[in-house]
Amino acid sequence: ISIRLVGSEMCIRDRNWCLNKKAEFKKLILMFQKEVADRIIAKVNTKDYSRITILANWKFNIKKIFDISPECFSPKPKIESTLLEFIPKKNIIKIRNPKNLENITKIFFSQRRKMVKKNMIRLFKNFESLTNKIDIKLTDRPQNISVDKFLILVKEYENQSN
């Protein structure tokens, strides 16, 4: 699918095109399965807060537009959908390698019910001073750590790897 409206800022493209190209845009409107959308827009300290929340919210301000009932489609799916608006953030916390964010969140959320202490000790030489510096308790669980704090952890990880 590729639709371009002349004189407009709207461009509708196949999702794979958007992911494989460096495109500049002011806003993205994307539809997701409701359960996935709930994870993307989840707040810290909630059960839906996860890796996908952090990865999506690193570069975007995201808000829910509305839910879409299965009755709106033909054939009718068995799931509900949600439309989300993604607006690129003007000021993001810069990290050298996005793979580090992916890897660190993967490590932390692979045992989401465990306290972060073991992962902090495993990843950071100076974990005690780091937890004080960014106000993370070793008894916290991954879903208690904000997106910005995860980004600071990644920056610290990259700095110690030099």
Question: What is each stretch, according to the model?
Answer:
Residues 1-12:
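Single conserved hydrophobic/aromatic residue that forms the stacking wall/gate
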Residues 150:
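Short, Lys/Arg-enriched alpha-helical microdomains
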Residues 153-155:
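Short hydrophobic alpha-helical segments that form membrane-spanning helices or hydrophobic packing faces
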